[in-house]
């Protein structure tokens, strides 16, 4: 038994639970594992200066048996002089909780443990999972087709939750309790093979142990190796994420150039808190690789639309442009100079401010290359543009065209959108500054107007866009 206590002390040190006056709450169900955890902590607490408390949540799922568990825990902690936090779930609590009954029970239990630790001023919450639990968990995830994280099993430490018994087998914990003359409660639900975990414990594990008597140790060791790999890849993912990210999206070319392991992690990181699963993740990546230079809706994840917008992957909760809402607003030019009027354009989620002045502006570039930053949200034109006809802000119409600055001819707006790889789904939503069928400014993208301002003192009209751009 001294050897077991020594190993337990070493486990606490590895977890960093070795500071004087450390406060710990022990999750105490009354089963052999948690009772053993409590007794081990009680024995080493003088050595470490640990202050203990226990917490028991009575779900009432097994009726009288659950109440007897709570009574047993209360008697045990009273005898050991360990403070106890005890809470009983309301009747038929599972009817108000989302998810399966088992998921809801786990959620309520962990919430109670967190509240108990806060009330006790405890830094740590100790759980009684051991090596056999680890092996069964790895097999469970393997049967479900989980990836590297699932096959990493149960972490020894996650947030405030610690598991000091992971290096120990179930059998040696029970032998310790017998040597101490300490009884424990038996959970009858563990006898039923209705639950997958119980079938793994009762049927699959014994069969596999006949092939490899050291199977539990093997699975635990493999889980440790995989967890180290997963942690390394997660760190690498965080390092490259900033390189792949652009504004609120991901650069598709940079994403598909990553090694597959990082590609998957970066995409899942982008989709958080949604968890699309490995098959969905790979399907999205396959679509991006096939069409990384094209604009299209890639997929839908958790109610969100993934769209490749000309090489940038973005996520949208809704696609209002699919409703194809036409809009048209005549633009009123201020009658007095240095005054502004503002026009709201709700369909494009923005507004246009129009100012008449004689101030000499900074020259603007007019080419078909990437626009300079000011041209995305601001434009200045000679007031002579009004001679062409009334100005308006609207979305696209059949027959729209724009002038090719610096060269003869025109270009259809449709061809411009194709050349700029602007997604078809977005084109009806983009606001345009127009004069008849001529597009003077594709707001957020480009201007096709020849009216550069080259003389001081000219009357000019300044257009400033406030709101979303593509």
UniProtKB/Swiss-Prot annotation:
Keywords: ATP-binding, Cytoplasm, Ligase, Nucleotide-binding, tRNA processing. GO terms for biological process: tRNA modification. ATP binds at residues 29-34. It is an enzyme of class 6 (ligase). It catalyses: cytidine(34) in tRNA(Ile2) + L-lysine + ATP = lysidine(34) in tRNA(Ile2) + AMP + diphosphate + H(+). It is found in: Cytoplasm. One of its GO terms (cellular component) is cytoplasm. Pfam families: ATP_bind_3 (PF01171), TilS_C (PF11734). Its EC number is 6.3.4.19. InterPro entries: Lysidine-tRNA-synth_C (IPR012796), Rossmann-like_a/b/a_fold (IPR014729), TilS/TtcA_N (IPR011063), tRNA_Ile_lys_synt (IPR012094), tRNA_Ile_lys_synt_N (IPR012795). One of its GO terms (molecular function) is tRNA(Ile)-lysidine synthase activity. Ligates lysine onto the cytidine present at position 34 of the AUA codon-specific tRNA(Ile) that contains the anticodon CAU, in an ATP-dependent manner. Cytidine is converted to lysidine, thus changing the amino acid specificity of the tRNA from methionine to isoleucine. The N-terminal region contains the highly conserved SGGXDS motif, predicted to be a P-loop motif involved in ATP binding. Belongs to the tRNA(Ile)-lysidine synthase family. HAMAP family: tRNA_Ile_lys_synt (MF_01161). This is tRNA(Ile)-lysidine synthase.
């Amino acid at each position: 038994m001294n050897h077991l206590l020594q190993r337990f002390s070493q486990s606490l040190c590895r977890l960093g639970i070795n500071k004087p006056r450390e406060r710990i709450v022990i999750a105490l169900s009354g089963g052999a594992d948690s009772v053993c955890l409590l007794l081990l902590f009680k024995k080493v607490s003088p050595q470490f200066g640990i202050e203990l408390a226990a917490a028991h949540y009575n779900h009432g799922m097994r009726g009288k048996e659950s109440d007897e568990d709570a009574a047993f825990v209360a008697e045990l902690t009273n005898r050991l002089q360990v403070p106890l936090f005890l809470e009983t779930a309301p009747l038929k609590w599972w009817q108000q909780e989302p998810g399966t009954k088992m998921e809801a029970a786990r959620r309520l239990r962990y919430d109670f443990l967190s509240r108990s630790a806060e009330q006790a001023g405890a830094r740590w919450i100790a759980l009684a999972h051991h090596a056999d639990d680890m092996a069964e968990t790895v097999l469970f995830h393997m049967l479900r087709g989980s990836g590297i994280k699932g096959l990493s099993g149960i972490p020894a430490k996650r947030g405030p939750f610690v598991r000091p018994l992971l290096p120990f087998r179930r059998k040696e914990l029970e032998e310790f309790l017998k040597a101490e003359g300490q009884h424990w409660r038996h959970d009858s639900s563990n006898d039923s093979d209705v639950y997958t975990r119980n079938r793994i414990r009762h049927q699959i594990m014994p069969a596999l142990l006949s092939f490899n008597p050291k199977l539990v140790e093997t699975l635990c060791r493999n889980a440790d190796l995989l967890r180290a790999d997963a942690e390394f890849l997660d760190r690498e993912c965080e390092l490259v994420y900033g390189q792949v990210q652009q504004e609120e999206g991901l650069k598709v070319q940079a994403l598909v150039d990553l090694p597959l392991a990082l590609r998957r992690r970066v995409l899942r990181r982008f989709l958080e808190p949604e968890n699309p699963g490995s098959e969905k993740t790979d399907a999205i990546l396959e679509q991006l690789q096939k069409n990384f230079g094209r604009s299209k809706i890639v997929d839908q994840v958790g109610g969100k639309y993934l769209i490749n917008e000309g090489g940038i992957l973005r996520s949208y909760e809704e696609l209002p442009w699919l409703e194809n809402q036409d809009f048209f607003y005549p633009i009123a030019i201020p009658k007095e100079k240095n005054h502004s009027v503002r026009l709201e354009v709700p369909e494009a989620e923005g507004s246009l401010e129009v100012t008449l002045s004689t101030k000499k502006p900074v020259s603007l570039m007019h080419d078909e290359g990437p626009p300079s930053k000011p041209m995305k949200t601001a434009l200045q034109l000679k007031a002579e543009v009004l001679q062409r006809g009334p100005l308006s802000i609207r979305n696209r119409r059949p027959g729209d065209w724009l002038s090719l600055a610096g060269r003869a001819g025109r270009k259809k707006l449709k061809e411009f959108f194709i050349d700029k790889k602007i997604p078809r789904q977005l084109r009806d939503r983009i606001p345009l500054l127009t004069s008849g069928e001529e597009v003077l400014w594709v707001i957020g993208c480009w201007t096709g107007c020849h009216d550069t301002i080259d003389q001081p003192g000219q009357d000019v009209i300044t257009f400033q866009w406030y709101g979303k751009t593509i």
